[in-house]
């Protein structure tokens, strides 16, 4: 691993297959739960997000009111290019995961089946990270933020049969 040294904090930019335990609530998409096995993208380092930032002190408390959340969050969701799809698969079985990410968007596939397509994928360089942990995070549009560790009651593991990373201009 090569780390690039100390840097200022950055706004979230991610494109991933991600599992959040029931203790998590990272709700990026209006219609997708904040936990579970997902395909997702987010890019808060975009001009629309910066333009919307001055409204946060008013918008975040208002989103605690369900009708306001339904009205306001889609604007925020578009601004941070958040897209998610819950994956209805057995995580303990072998699967082939594919992520095609280009300048015009991204497509996520599981076992060859398209599970998420977006035209607003993160721009710029990102690193490949694969991990397993026992952390839980809460980060909601209505202002709930928290972090904790979750006790592990049984062995945890991640198995990879093959990994291929290719770079291509699209």
Task: Go through each PLM region and give its residues.
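Short strand-turn-strand beta-turns centered on an Asx-Gly dipeptide
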Residues: 109-113
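Residue-level structural signal for beta-strand termini and adjacent loop
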Residues: 120-121
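Ligand-recognition surfaces built from glycine- and aromatic
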Residues: 124-170
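Short tryptophan-centered beta-strand motifs in secreted/extracellular beta-sheet-rich domains
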Residues: 93-101, 106-108
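Generic structural motif
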Residues: 6, 20-22, 33, 104, ...
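Short, aromatic/His-centered strand-loop micro-motif at the edge of beta-sheets
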Residues: 36-49, 71-96
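Secretory/extracellular carbohydrate-interaction modules
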Residues: 1-70
């Amino acid at each position: 691993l090569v780390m690039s040294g100390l840097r200022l904090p950055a706004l979230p930019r991610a494109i991933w297959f991600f599992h959040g335990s029931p203790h998590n609530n990272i709700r990026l998409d209006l219609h997708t739960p904040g936990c579970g096995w997902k395909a997702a993208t987010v890019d808060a380092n975009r001009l629309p997000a910066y333009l919307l930032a001055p409204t946060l002190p008013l918008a975040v408390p208002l989103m605690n009111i369900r009708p306001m959340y339904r009205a306001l969050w889609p604007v925020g969701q578009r601004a941070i290019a958040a897209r998610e799809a819950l994956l209805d698969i057995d995580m303990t079985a072998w699967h082939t995961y594919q992520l095609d990410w280009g300048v015009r968007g991204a497509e996520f596939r599981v076992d060859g089946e398209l599970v998420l397509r977006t035209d607003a994928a993160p721009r710029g360089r990102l690193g490949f990270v694969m991990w397993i942990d026992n952390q839980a995070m809460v980060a909601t549009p209505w202002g709930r933020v928290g972090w904790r560790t979750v006790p592990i009651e049984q062995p945890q593991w991640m198995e990879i049969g093959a990994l291929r990373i290719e770079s291509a201009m699209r």
